[in-house]
UniProtKB/Swiss-Prot annotation:
Family label: Belongs to the RimP family.
NCBIfam families, sorted: PRK14639.1
GO cellular component, one term: cytosol
Alphabetical keyword list: Cytoplasm, Ribosome biogenesis
Transmembrane segments: none
Name of the featured protein: Ribosome maturation factor RimP
Alphabetized InterPro entries for the sequence: Ribosome_maturation_RimP (IPR003728), RimP_C (IPR028998), RimP_C_sf (IPR036847), RimP_N (IPR028989), RimP_N_sf (IPR035956)
Function field: Required for maturation of 30S ribosomal subunits.
Keyword Cytoplasm found: yes
Gene from which the chain derives: rimP
Pfam families: DUF150_C (PF17384), RimP_N (PF02576)
Alphabetical GO biological process terms: ribosomal small subunit assembly; translation
């Protein structure tokens, strides 16, 4: 099963997926993006495409609930592609050394992310492998 192709069929871009447990129930979440924003109808359409396929080829074992959602303005960045699609956005990063950074993503290559410090405008480059946790954020 190719989630990226199925999302494309619904006019969406696959962003990420995850399996979580909430209140003792398994939830399989599929996060999507779309130029101009994801609407509720987009999520419903993709859910209608995925449900019969997942009935035959479940993405996880056992009973679960399927959720289709926009990845949101403030979203987790866990793949190098996520950083590449987020150039010029603000990000909060925790490094493997537990250093906390708030910066703007300036550029991304195969292994590195270049950031601009929000306070000093100083540029720094981090190895993707040194990033423990990252999330975009919006200043209101």
């Amino acid at each position: 099963m190719n989630l990226e192709a199925l999302c494309k069929e619904a006019g969406l871009s696959f962003y990420d997926d995850e399996l979580v447990s909430e209140n003792g129930k398994k939830i399989y979440r599929v996060y999507v993006q779309k130029e101009g924003g994801v609407k509720l109808d987009d999520c419903a359409r993709l859910s209608e495409i995925l449900s019969p396929i997942f009935d035959v080829e479940p993405p996880v074992s056992g009973e679960y609930f399927l959720e289709v959602s926009s990845c949101g303005l403030e979203r987790k960045l866990s793949k190098i592609e996520h950083f590449a699609k987020s150039i010029n956005e603000l990000v909060k990063i925790t490094t493997s050394e537990k250093e906390k950074i708030e910066a703007k993503i300036v550029s991304v290559d195969d292994e590195n992310i270049t950031l601009e410090n929000l306070k000093t405008q100083e540029k720094t480059t981090l190895k993707f492998s040194d990033i423990r946790k990252a999330r975009t954020f919006v200043e209101w």
